[in-house]
Design a protein with these regions (language model features):
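Short, Lys/Arg-rich flexible segments
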Residues: 1-192
Length: 192
C-alpha cells in the first residue's frame, strides 16, 4: 500500500484552508446565481397596470435585493436580504396623464395615467406631505382617507421565486460548484 500512504501524506501536507476557501467560493457563486435567477423570474412574470402588462424592468427588481457574501473571516454563509414591500408605480418611469377620447375597455372615461407601457385608470400624480411624488388613486371602501398610493405587489412573487430558486440550486448545482471550487483550489495550490 505504498501509493495509499503516499496519497495520505500528500493530502495531509496540503493547505488546511483549501477546503474552507473552496466551500466559500461555491456558496458565493450559488448565492449570486440564486439572486440572478429569482430576480429575472420575478421581473419577467409580474403583471402591472390596469392593462395587465406582463414584465417589469429588471433593474427595479434587482435594486430590492442585497447579497452579503461569505468570507474567510469566520462568516461561512452568504446572506440575501430582500425588500419585499410593494413597488410604487411612480418608479416605473416618467408619467403622462391623458384624457381619454376613444372608446375601449380601458380608455372609456376620465383620465388615464400612462407610465411606459403601463396604464392606470383614474390615477393622478400628487406630492405627499413627506415631499415625495406618488401615483395616487381613489379607493372604494376606505372611509377616512379615500385615496391611496398605486403599488405593484411583489411580496408573494419575490418570496416564492427565491425559495424555489435557492432550493433547486442547492439540490442540483451545489455539488457541481463544490467540485469545481475544490479543483480550482487544488490547481492554485499546486501551481505555487
Amino acid at each position: 500500500m505504498k501509493g495509499l500512504e503516499n496519497a495520505i501524506r500528500n493530502l495531509n501536507s496540503l493547505d488546511r484552508q483549501m477546503v474552507p476557501r473552496a466551500s466559500i467560493w461555491a456558496v458565493n457563486r450559488m448565492a449570486q446565481k440564486a439572486v440572478s435567477v429569482a430576480t429575472r423570474k420575478v421581473a419577467r412574470e409580474t403583471v402591472a397596470g390596469d392593462n395587465q402588462v406582463r414584465g417589469l424592468p429588471l433593474k427595479l427588481v434587482r435594486q430590492r435585493v442585497r447579497l452579503f457574501k461569505a468570507g474567510t473571516d469566520g462568516k461561512r454563509s452568504a446572506r440575501i436580504r430582500i425588500n419585499r414591500g410593494n413597488l410604487p408605480a411612480i418608479k416605473l418611469g416618467a408619467a403622462q396623464v391623458r384624457m381619454s377620447k376613444r372608446r375601449g375597455k380601458l380608455l372609456y372615461r376620465g383620465s388615464v395615467l400612462k407610465i411606459g407601457p403601463y396604464l392606470f385608470r383614474d390615477a393622478f400624480i400628487q406630492q405627499l406631505a413627506n415631499g415625495r411624488w406618488h401615483v395616487m388613486r381613489r379607493v372604494n371602501g376606505k372611509n377616512r382617507y379615500p385615496i391611496d398610493v398605486v403599488k405593484i405587489p411583489l411580496s408573494g412573487p419575490l418570496t416564492q421565486a427565491f425559495e424555489s430558486a435557492t432550493q433547486s440550486l442547492i439540490d442540483e448545482e451545489m455539488p457541481k460548484q463544490l467540485g469545481y471550487a475544490l479543483k480550482q483550489q487544488l490547481r492554485l495550490y499546486l501551481s505555487r
